[in-house]
Amino acid sequence: DGIASITTTQKHSEYDTNWQDEVLKTALVQDYNVSLSGGGDSGSYFVSAGYYNNDGVSYGNTFDRYSFRVNTQGKKGWFSFGENLAYSLTNTDPNQTNTYNDFLRMMPTIPVYDENNPGGYGYGDAAKYNTFGVNPIARENLEKRHMRQNRLNGSLWLEFKPFEFLSYKFNGGVDLYFYENSWFRGEGNWQQNQEHRDPESQKARDNTYNMLIEHTLNFNKDFGKHHVDAVLGTTYQHHEWEGLWASRLNFPMLGNGDYLTVLNAGQSNQQNTNSISENAMISYLGRVNY
């Protein structure tokens, strides 16, 4: 009847992959917080701790954070003091691709896994199921990134007031930040026409240290009809930063199918960079009002 016969490439595939179900999931979000506070005439305190976890709705994406904070202050005779300390630790495993865009481009006739392709993942071919979309499951399994951040921020102050008109105050603060970024790319492909790549690992670290120290002397007094207030002080600021990056290729695979990703296990293409910066500033200040 003039109707062309069905060709092999037009036949219905044995696969019916629901890429949305493969990539998206119901994510568990957890958020826990506990705090303790109290005090009296001579001082007060506040302590809190928290944990937050988000598994992420897309495949391969997770985030968690630990936090701790303490704040105290007190007074004893001529002395008063206080401090504020905050610490946080975060771990992030981000997506390496736009998973929403990728699963929309993948045909349901393409399986998630295909042992005939390098790495064992399906992504179609030029003869049938032709697409240049990215298999998001393959990419998240073959390319992994983990970011870890530690931060400690704290301040301490101490005031000595032997007379109503005269006081000395010390203030010190630190801000410590440690960042690690680990990336690994295993052997295998996640889309058509990809060039072969050997297993590769990259690691980066940034360490930042900031410090502030202040000393101030305050005078405030009336002399009959006259009034004088004055401030005399000094401040010191110090900053240090160090960055380190390293990369290796050709990592061995263990018996369980995982790679040995320690940088020293990389067998070729060793690359390293290291940078350091440091600066400091000291200032003197004074003011008199009459």
What is the predicted role of each segment?
Residues 28, 32-38, 280-290:
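Structured alpha-helical segments in the cores of large, soluble enzyme domains
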Residues 23-24, 31-53, 57, 69-75, ...:
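Predominantly transmembrane beta-strands of Gram-negative outer membrane beta-barrel pores used
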Residues 29, 40-41, 75-79, 161-163, ...:
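Outer-membrane beta-barrel channels and translocator barrels
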Residues 1-16, 56-153, 169-283:
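Surface-exposed loop/interface segments of Gram-negative outer-membrane beta-barrel transport/assembly proteins
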Residues 16-27:
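Periplasmic N-terminal accessory/gating domains of Gram-negative outer-membrane beta-barrel systems
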Residues 35-41, 188, 252-255, 289:
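Short glycine/proline-enriched loop/turn "hinge" motifs that connect secondary-structure elements
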